Amino acid sequence: MMRTHEAGSLRAGHAGQSVTLAGWVARRRDHGGVIFIDLRDASGVAQVVFREGEMAERAHRLRSEFCLRITGEVVRRPEGNENPEIGTGDIEVTATELEVLSESAPLPFPLDEHLEVGEETRLRHRYLDLRRNGPAKAMRMRSEVNRIARDVLHGRDFVEVETPTMTRSTPEGARDFLIPARLQPGNWYALPQSPQLFKQLLMVGGLERYFQIARCYRDEDFRADRQPEFTQLDIEMSFVDQDDVIELGEEIISALWRETAGHEIPRPIQRMTYADAMARFGTDKPDLRFGLELTEMTEYFADTPFRVFRAPYVGAVVMPGGADQPRRQLDAWQDWAKQRGAKGLAYVLVGQDGTLSGPVAKNLSDGERDGLVKAVGAAPGDCVFFAAGDRSSSRALLGAARLEIGERCGLIDHDAWSFVWVVDAPMFESIDDTDDVAVGSGRWTAVHHPFTSPNADWVDNFESDPANALAWAYDIVCNGNEIGGGSIRIHRSDVQKRVFELLGISEEQAQDKFGFLLEAFKYGPPPHGGIAFGWDRICMLLAGADSLRDVIAFPKSGGGYDPLTGAPSPITVEQRKEAGVDAKPAAKVGDESISVFPPGVVEKQG
């Protein structure tokens, strides 16, 4: 046996026992010829003492991160030398045997938790970073999150199924990571962007309740909150409606927060329509930890003399106490808005006597000035920010301003948890209103994906008014972060055909890209729906981390680069030839590239 006890498990009750420990030297101190080391293993730290004589002599050569095996007697620390900060603070181990299992080179950075170390350096030596308490704790918490979810789902008779990670390239919005098929030169596998189509096939196969902690891959341009490979808790259920999926989602989320954060989520979690979220908060991911809301002012300024406010949409958001901001701070708000692609952020200052000032106020009519404070819910001393233009971008700007105001004014309780379901999402959006890759060649693209079912009010007539058609789609939001989302799927072939026609996807194109799914749907598919939770983001929130990278064992940095292994890296000419990278298959007639899943948060594919 390499060791008899874990270092962090020792307590006063072990006093008098002989123990053998194994771990790393976290700290070494020399006090008048007596050597003290903090021996660290996965369980914690124990203080080991090498008294004068041979043991102290042998301990002199020990350095940080030497890997040791030590035998000694557990004794209580002298009175006054206890350390209440650690679980083993009442005892120490007097060493009688020492074995150096391996030595350590000088460290590239100190492993002290209290010292700041650059992220690139930490990721390059991630194996050392994981010896620190914070990263190690995040990994253990993530393992616990997996266990909790599995317990909930197994308790409901769900079946954990592993779907392929080498599959056919199917259009799902982002680019695929491709793998050459060596035995079939010119042909390629793709790594899955999600298990979406396979989990629907499992429902056709009669499994009824499926889940998977799934690895997914998207070859996207770098974004700060994304990783090219990520994890989602993927779920699909047969014979369910939207309420059934939401109820299961709430049980999972409640169990996670209760068992890892000690927080009991009030249930049922409130619901808000997509339209309401956009109108009140300027986003479909509203942070409800504070109550500041947008006010639409389009009708109020319908006859305004101010040319800037003669726009399809005018909205406002109030900054409490913002009238006291100096001019340079108000100018900084303009720079803030321009960084988000806007021309600026109009504002009106409300004086303590109720008078309005600022560059916008003088351009308003007397009637507009007189009623403005009441219309937006402002008070003396407040600043009112405005955005005018198209509805989508103006709301987005005000929504971002709302969050910035919340931070600057201390309105957000960072110890609070606030959850909301956003439901009744639009089924389609015009290709003119999105930067996403168009779905098919029609005027409309799917907001979620083209297998999302229209809701009961729209299933028979969505073609008549695509702009207002609503889907059985739902996202769950925590503190302004989308942590999961899904939909009820189309299981009727006639409805699926009509959706494809509206999106401009021909029958030939549909068969070429995902004919295997359409073929399966000929054989009595059940009504089904599901959800996918963004596992990395959930773990980040539960760990109180600032970045997804903090809760991933070996994350990528900017642009998908791995500082640890140097991936991606070139391959040799021989590897390239053997893999058939340059082989060209015979072109198929009518083989057109269609994007079916718009780029976006992976949970939307759930």
From Swiss-Prot:
<feature type="region of interest" description="Aspartate">
    <location>
        <begin position="196"/>
        <end position="199"/>
    </location>
</feature>
<feature type="binding site">
    <location>
        <position position="489"/>
    </location>
    <ligand>
        <name>L-aspartate</name>
    </ligand>
</feature>
<dbReference type="Pfam" id="PF02938">
    <property type="entry name" value="GAD"/>
</dbReference>
<dbReference type="InterPro" id="IPR012340">
    <property type="entry name" value="NA-bd_OB-fold"/>
</dbReference>
<keyword id="KW-0030">Aminoacyl-tRNA synthetase</keyword>
<dbReference type="GO" id="GO:0050560">
    <property type="term" value="F:aspartate-tRNA(Asn) ligase activity"/>
</dbReference>
<dbReference type="Pfam" id="PF01336">
    <property type="entry name" value="tRNA_anti-codon"/>
</dbReference>
<dbReference type="InterPro" id="IPR029351">
    <property type="entry name" value="GAD_dom"/>
</dbReference>
<dbReference type="InterPro" id="IPR045864">
    <property type="entry name" value="aa-tRNA-synth_II/BPL/LPL"/>
</dbReference>
<comment type="subunit">
    <text>Homodimer.</text>
</comment>
<dbReference type="InterPro" id="IPR047089">
    <property type="entry name" value="Asp-tRNA-ligase_1_N"/>
</dbReference>
<feature type="binding site">
    <location>
        <position position="218"/>
    </location>
    <ligand>
        <name>L-aspartate</name>
    </ligand>
</feature>
<dbReference type="InterPro" id="IPR004365">
    <property type="entry name" value="NA-bd_OB_tRNA"/>
</dbReference>
<comment type="function">
    <text>Aspartyl-tRNA synthetase with relaxed tRNA specificity since it is able to aspartylate not only its cognate tRNA(Asp) but also tRNA(Asn). Reaction proceeds in two steps: L-aspartate is first activated by ATP to form Asp-AMP and then transferred to the acceptor end of tRNA(Asp/Asn).</text>
</comment>
<feature type="binding site">
    <location>
        <begin position="218"/>
        <end position="220"/>
    </location>
    <ligand>
        <name>ATP</name>
    </ligand>
</feature>
<feature type="binding site">
    <location>
        <position position="227"/>
    </location>
    <ligand>
        <name>ATP</name>
    </ligand>
</feature>
<dbReference type="GO" id="GO:0004815">
    <property type="term" value="F:aspartate-tRNA ligase activity"/>
</dbReference>
<keyword id="KW-0067">ATP-binding</keyword>
<keyword id="KW-0436">Ligase</keyword>
<feature type="binding site">
    <location>
        <position position="482"/>
    </location>
    <ligand>
        <name>ATP</name>
    </ligand>
</feature>
<dbReference type="GO" id="GO:0006422">
    <property type="term" value="P:aspartyl-tRNA aminoacylation"/>
</dbReference>
<keyword id="KW-0963">Cytoplasm</keyword>
<dbReference type="GO" id="GO:0005524">
    <property type="term" value="F:ATP binding"/>
</dbReference>
<dbReference type="InterPro" id="IPR004524">
    <property type="entry name" value="Asp-tRNA-ligase_1"/>
</dbReference>
<keyword id="KW-0547">Nucleotide-binding</keyword>
<protein>
    <recommendedName>
        <fullName>Aspartate--tRNA(Asp/Asn) ligase</fullName>
        <ecNumber>6.1.1.23</ecNumber>
    </recommendedName>
</protein>
<feature type="binding site">
    <location>
        <position position="448"/>
    </location>
    <ligand>
        <name>L-aspartate</name>
    </ligand>
</feature>
<dbReference type="InterPro" id="IPR002312">
    <property type="entry name" value="Asp/Asn-tRNA-synth_IIb"/>
</dbReference>
<dbReference type="GO" id="GO:0005737">
    <property type="term" value="C:cytoplasm"/>
</dbReference>
<dbReference type="GO" id="GO:0003676">
    <property type="term" value="F:nucleic acid binding"/>
</dbReference>
<dbReference type="InterPro" id="IPR047090">
    <property type="entry name" value="AspRS_core"/>
</dbReference>
<dbReference type="InterPro" id="IPR006195">
    <property type="entry name" value="aa-tRNA-synth_II"/>
</dbReference>
<keyword id="KW-0648">Protein biosynthesis</keyword>
<feature type="site" description="Important for tRNA non-discrimination">
    <location>
        <position position="80"/>
    </location>
</feature>
<feature type="site" description="Important for tRNA non-discrimination">
    <location>
        <position position="31"/>
    </location>
</feature>
<dbReference type="InterPro" id="IPR004364">
    <property type="entry name" value="Aa-tRNA-synt_II"/>
</dbReference>
<feature type="binding site">
    <location>
        <begin position="534"/>
        <end position="537"/>
    </location>
    <ligand>
        <name>ATP</name>
    </ligand>
</feature>
<comment type="similarity">
    <text>Belongs to the class-II aminoacyl-tRNA synthetase family. Type 1 subfamily.</text>
</comment>
<dbReference type="Pfam" id="PF00152">
    <property type="entry name" value="tRNA-synt_2"/>
</dbReference>
<feature type="binding site">
    <location>
        <position position="172"/>
    </location>
    <ligand>
        <name>L-aspartate</name>
    </ligand>
</feature>
<dbReference type="InterPro" id="IPR004115">
    <property type="entry name" value="GAD-like_sf"/>
</dbReference>
